[in-house]
Amino acid sequence: MNFIDVAKIYEKIEATTGRLEMIDYLKNLFLSTPPEILDKIVYLTLGNIAASFEGIELGVGEKLFLRALSLATGIPQERLEEEYPKLGDIGKLAEWAVSKKAAQSFFTEDLTVERVFDTLSKVARATGEGAQDLKVRLIAGILSDAKPLEARYIARIVTEKLRLGVRDMTVLDALSEAFLKGRAYRDKLERKYNIYPDIGKIAKVVAEKGIKGLDEITITLGIPVRPMLAQRLRSAEEIMEKIGPRIFAEFKYDGERMQIHVWKDGKVKIFSRRLEDITEPYPDVREYVSKAVEGHEVVLDCETVAINPDTGEILPFQELMHRRRKYGVEEAMKTYPTVTYAFDLLYLDGRELLDEQLDDRRKILKEILKENEKARLVQYEEIDGNVEELERFFEHAVEMGTEGLVVKDPKSIYQAGVRGWSWIKLKRSYISKMIEPVDLVVVGAFWGKGKRAGTYGALLMAAYSPEEDVFKTVCKMGSGFTDEELARMPKLLEDYKIDHKHPSVISNIEADVYFVPVKVAQVLGDEITLSPTHTCGWNKVRKNAGLAIRFPRFMGWRDDKGPQDATTEEEIIEMYKEQLKVVEVEETKSEEEA
Ligand SMILES: Nc1ncnc2c1ncn2[C@@H]1O[C@H](COP(=O)(O)OP(=O)(O)OP(=O)(O)O)[C@@H](O)[C@H]1O
């Protein structure tokens, strides 16, 4: 197939304003393409040379392209640079340059689609020393045999500026028209695309085998499935009304979505929410997840969070991103170790599970997942009709450092690529920050792990209630200490240690060690949230709930303060209410803006 036939259709597509017309042109293009190269045509039409999840970038800069154009046409680069602004588009420039040269030569070879495609693949894959020169030579090679119109599109494709406005969905429409008897199988085609988003391969299969070909498309290890997404509602009550009384309420971890493919021999590939291959920066995840599903082939849907290695607490999302940026992987693995929570199973040992109910998928997932310290099953609760229970679980989830809940319909199938109502998220809506530190009393401690073995990993902190003359817990604090402070801590607190909870402390939490409430520390958190466990503010803001400080950090000891000078319960309640007002204002503001 000659590239000029494709270029002519691109020219028509470029000129059209009607979507149906565009689909028609594409349909004709696809029908006139030999099936065995239809994948190549589809990738090129989308301005690419592979499925987008492969992340292969042509990425040829304009400067480099002008060098190639100059080499191919004999027109000096300065001259091209002069002409470029007048034409305003790299494609038009290439067309102009090649037409000037074409006037003087007659012996050019016809360019085939295969040759253009293979050359572009080589351009994309050229790396290392001499890669730039090689790219220039490769591009110049096809440009010297190109007709002006061909040069226009080659220029735009290599510089990633094709902009025909053809998207995956348009290609699916055209494929339906061309090979699947119009619209009858359009939905099925899209479902297949959602589980196998390599649109070139799909095109080839339906061109070669028609409707029967559709059935051959299945979940395949190494090809990412488009993830199912969640809707959002504002309250537990609304959610229960929407889904029905029986639900799965799952922690909504604030980390990175990971679709993890594991082969029988332990090989692993990890895909992000946007289907990028993120296997490389997560050697730890590869290891512990493959161990947890040893002997099986699986596709797991998971969320991976960074944790504080010393306390096991979940850290905010940003900390995980160090993996991709600031730190080297090795160092990030130590400073920000991860835990992966699996919440769905899409494929097991050759069997596609998408059409099974969540109830059943979960059962199978539980059976095959041999949990270890780092590869865990999502924390969830099955709730039947009790809105209050759902609210409480939400508060618990927030207190544990998550964003809230994803509530799911146990009877639902896995809808790849769809934001449906069988998954609904309930997020904490506070956006305000806690800007003022508080002074809290140490009433207990928990032994540390890892680097903190032998000292405390976290302290149990309480606010003071002058009316009742008691201390009520408001957070577990495990961050913000220097190594020296940590090392000194057992000794520093030794004098206050007792073997039971002090009678003036009101707590629902069992600590490893208890103290007489004396030592005061300054603490800064991210915000104050409702809590099903902490006793500060209990029943005073909401029935059966207290208040907790989220992500508390140690700012220093307040040796100038005694326990009665600590921040009071009433002050914490006030801060919580203030914060709510700020949120309401911000929410109205953003609603007005929307
Ligand atoms: N138990 C869970 N089930 C499903 N998704 C979860 C779960 N825990 C955490 N998540 C994360 O929450 C997201 C679900 O929300 P949604 O589908 O709306 O994604 P989003 O558009 O990225 O939104 P958000 O910004 O709220 O994460 C998932 O993409 C996933 O990364």
UniProtKB/Swiss-Prot annotation:
Q: Cofactor(s) for this protein?
A: Mg(2+)
Q: What Enzyme Commission number does this protein have?
A: 6.5.1.1
Binding of ATP occurs at E250, R257, R273, E303, F343, R419, K425
**Can the keyword Cell division be found in this entry's annotation?**
yes
Q: Which residues form the active site?
A: K252
> NCBIfam families per the record?
dnl1 (TIGR00574)
Question: Would you tell me the protein name for this molecule?
Answer: DNA ligase 2
What taxonomic classification does the UniProt entry list for its organism?
A: Archaea, Thermoproteota, Candidatus Korarchaeia, Candidatus Korarchaeales, Candidatus Korarchaeaceae
List the gene name: lig2
